Curated annotation (Swiss-Prot):
GO terms for biological process: amino acid biosynthetic process; aromatic amino acid family biosynthetic process; chorismate biosynthetic process. Pathway: Metabolic intermediate biosynthesis; chorismate biosynthesis; chorismate from D-erythrose 4-phosphate and phosphoenolpyruvate: step 2/7. Its cofactor is Co(2+); Zn(2+); NAD(+). This is 3-dehydroquinate synthase. NCBIfam families: aroB (TIGR01357). The gene is aroB.
Length: 363
């Protein structure tokens, strides 16, 4: 069964299609968008080995001229050097303004392909075909693109909305368990910030740590409700002028932890899980949230097989210092997304270094 979610924006609206066994229909899907004939498919070697031929064959059968390029896998390759390689390939293949870059992969591939598309010829089409749970429910939707700077995550980037997002849930069967768990962090996030019903559904599942233990109807709900939540928020605030900031729940401390560990120790979702535990406890200590609800959140994070403690030996003062480089800093103050009840959050700059330190020392 195909679910279609509309992302309605003033600049460019688009569809998210969630359809099992749809990867071999990508050419047909793109043919209806009236794009130019040239396509650059960007992936990584592992993903391309599994799904590259199916995608390329489908695009070529629909009349597209397809070039493909694989970037190395991993957050540490999310750099301007990788973008330069994509520019070189775009130049070699004479990509025009009507051309399209297709991101076939997880969040790293999606972010880099989107940024390359945003900046090549001042902006060409991009289509997102996410292959990880995290990318399906989060990074492929909403137009945030970018790369990391040695001093911080996603400091270099642009907003560039995709023309289309194609989600084939069947590709998750090849996803490593650790990657699946990392994606569950973003799903839990939506339950905390926006969708209490999704949170309740997650609580009712005995296990969340592996795809094979999750009932198909719950997996459908995870994908559709998460994508709908992201579409709702982005539709109300495309460029993070206000409401969209709530999507950064757990990411403030999470990004700092990723940066301090050089993007090598933790998956993004693992860092976000740790960040949600920290933000939840800060909210409790400030009197904004009930401890019982924070405990419910933390139990879900643990049920998903995610860490809830800081990596051993991590410098807490280093985390606090890294927070000053967060994109959400305004007038020198770190803005935190904090829950007030399940499904509702607030954004505040009233969190001090002492508040943060007190919580991190207990983690």
């Amino acid at each position: 069964m195909t679910s279609v979610i509309n992302v309605n924006l003033p600049t460019q609206s688009y569809e998210i299609a969630i359809a099992p066994a749809s990867l071999d229909q990508i050419g047909q899907s793109l043919a209806g968008l009236k794009l130019g004939k040239k396509v650059l498919l960007v992936s990584n070697p592992t993903i391309f080995k599994h799904f590259g031929k199916v995608a390329v064959d489908s695009l070529e059968a629909a009349g597209f001229q397809v070039a493909s390029y694989c970037l190395p896998a991993g957050e540490r390759y999310k750099t301007l050097n990788s973008i330069q390689k994509l520019y070189d390939i775009a130049l070699e293949n004479r990509l025009e303004r009507s051309s399209t870059m297709v991101a076939l992969g997880g969040g790293v591939i999606g972010d880099m392909t989107g940024f390359a598309a945003a900046t090549w010829l001042r902006g060409i089409n991009v289509v997102q075909v996410p292959t990880t749970l995290l990318a399906m429910v989060d990074s492929a939707i909403g137009g945030k693109t970018g790369v990391n700077h040695p001093h911080g995550k996603n400091l270099i980037g642009a907003f560039h909305q995709p023309r289309f997002v194609l989600i084939d849930p069947q590709v998750l069967k090849t996803l490593p368990v650790r990657e699946f768990r990392a994606g569950m962090a973003e799903v839990i996030k939506y339950g905390v910030i926006w969708d209490a019903e999704l949170f309740n559904q997650l609580e009712q599942s005995k296990r969340l740590d592996q795809l094979r233990y999750i009932k198909p109807e719950l997996m459908d709900a995870i994908l559709t409700r998460s994508c709908q939540a992201k579409a709702d928020v982005v539709g109300k605030d495309e460029k993070e002028g206000g409401l969209r900031a709530i999507l950064n729940y757990g990411h403030t401390v999470g990004h700092a932890v990723e940066s301090l560990t050089n993007y090598r120790l933790l998956k993004h979702g693992e860092a976000v899980g740790i960040g949600m535990v920290a933000a939840g406890q800060i909210a409790v200590n400030l009197g904004l949230w009930q401890q019982a609800d924070a405990d419910r959140q933390n139990a879900l994070i643990e049920k998903a097989g995610l860490p809830t403690k800081l990596p051993a030996g991590l410098d807490i003062e280093g985390i606090i210092e890294a927070l000053q480089l967060d994109k959400k800093v305004k007038d020198g103050k770190v803005r935190f997304v904090l829950p007030t009840q399940i499904g509702v959050v607030t954004v505040t700059d009233e969190v001090t270094s002492d508040h943060i330190r007190q919580v991190l020392q207990q983690m």
